[in-house]
């Protein structure tokens, strides 16, 4: 059995749907929300790689490296902010972080 473009796109769609479900079902823990957002970015990256491979164009695969770089920086900044919130509030639940409201 060979893997076709449809297999990769369906896997990417399933990963994207799983991350959306993770965002909607878990609205309490910020770390799990950050992980769900990262899973969403990885699903989109997988679709970019699949399309660029099957079209014979390297631009999609090069674009994925830029997206992964930005995602790594986003994760590092997000985790640093979560560590600061945990140090100040000793809690990272979304419901109890109402001091951030403007």
From Swiss-Prot:
<dbReference type="Pfam" id="PF00420">
    <property type="entry name" value="Oxidored_q2"/>
</dbReference>
<feature type="transmembrane region" description="Helical">
    <location>
        <begin position="5"/>
        <end position="25"/>
    </location>
</feature>
<dbReference type="GO" id="GO:0030964">
    <property type="term" value="C:NADH dehydrogenase complex"/>
</dbReference>
<dbReference type="GO" id="GO:0042773">
    <property type="term" value="P:ATP synthesis coupled electron transport"/>
</dbReference>
<dbReference type="GO" id="GO:0005886">
    <property type="term" value="C:plasma membrane"/>
</dbReference>
<keyword id="KW-0520">NAD</keyword>
<protein>
    <recommendedName>
        <fullName>NADH-quinone oxidoreductase subunit K</fullName>
        <ecNumber>7.1.1.-</ecNumber>
    </recommendedName>
</protein>
<keyword id="KW-0812">Transmembrane</keyword>
<comment type="subunit">
    <text>NDH-1 is composed of 14 different subunits. Subunits NuoA, H, J, K, L, M, N constitute the membrane sector of the complex.</text>
</comment>
<keyword id="KW-1133">Transmembrane helix</keyword>
<keyword id="KW-1003">Cell membrane</keyword>
<keyword id="KW-0813">Transport</keyword>
<dbReference type="InterPro" id="IPR001133">
    <property type="entry name" value="NADH_UbQ_OxRdtase_chain4L/K"/>
</dbReference>
<dbReference type="InterPro" id="IPR039428">
    <property type="entry name" value="NUOK/Mnh_C1-like"/>
</dbReference>
<dbReference type="GO" id="GO:0048038">
    <property type="term" value="F:quinone binding"/>
</dbReference>
<feature type="transmembrane region" description="Helical">
    <location>
        <begin position="62"/>
        <end position="82"/>
    </location>
</feature>
<dbReference type="GO" id="GO:0050136">
    <property type="term" value="F:NADH:ubiquinone reductase (non-electrogenic) activity"/>
</dbReference>
<keyword id="KW-1278">Translocase</keyword>
<keyword id="KW-0874">Quinone</keyword>
<comment type="function">
    <text>NDH-1 shuttles electrons from NADH, via FMN and iron-sulfur (Fe-S) centers, to quinones in the respiratory chain. The immediate electron acceptor for the enzyme in this species is believed to be ubiquinone. Couples the redox reaction to proton translocation (for every two electrons transferred, four hydrogen ions are translocated across the cytoplasmic membrane), and thus conserves the redox energy in a proton gradient.</text>
</comment>
<comment type="similarity">
    <text>Belongs to the complex I subunit 4L family.</text>
</comment>
<keyword id="KW-0997">Cell inner membrane</keyword>
<feature type="transmembrane region" description="Helical">
    <location>
        <begin position="31"/>
        <end position="51"/>
    </location>
</feature>
<keyword id="KW-0830">Ubiquinone</keyword>
<keyword id="KW-0472">Membrane</keyword>
């Amino acid at each position: 059995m060979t893997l076709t473009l449809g297999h990769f796109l369906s896997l990417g769609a399933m990963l994207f749907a799983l991350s959306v479900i993770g965002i909607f079902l878990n609205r309490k823990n910020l770390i799990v929300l950050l992980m769900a957002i990262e899973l969403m970015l990885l699903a989109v990256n997988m679709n970019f790689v699949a399309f660029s491979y099957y079209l014979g164009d390297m631009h999609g695969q090069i674009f994925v490296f830029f997206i992964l770089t930005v995602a790594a920086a986003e994760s590092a900044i997000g985790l640093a902010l979560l560590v600061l919130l945990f140090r100040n509030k000793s809690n990272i639940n979304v419901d109890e972080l109402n001091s951030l409201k403007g």
